[in-house]
Amino acid sequence: TPPQPADNFIRF
């Protein structure tokens, strides 16, 4: 699955 915007925020 492609990285979603919400996932990006969690990655940070």
Curated annotation (Swiss-Prot):
Keyword Secreted: yes
Keywords, ordered alphabetically: Amidation, Neuropeptide, Secreted
Biological-process GO terms, alphabetical: neuropeptide signaling pathway
Protein family according to the UniProt entry: Belongs to the FARP (FMRFamide related peptide) family.
UniProt subcellular location: Secreted
Entry superkingdom: Eukaryota
Tissue: Detected in the thoracic perisympathetic organs in larvae, and the dorsal ganglionic sheath in adults (at protein level).
Residues recorded as bearing Phenylalanine amide in the entry: 12
Protein's name according to its UniProt entry: FMRFamide-18
Keyword Isomerase among UniProt keywords: no
GO cellular component: extracellular region
Lineage: Eukaryota, Metazoa, Ecdysozoa, Arthropoda, Hexapoda
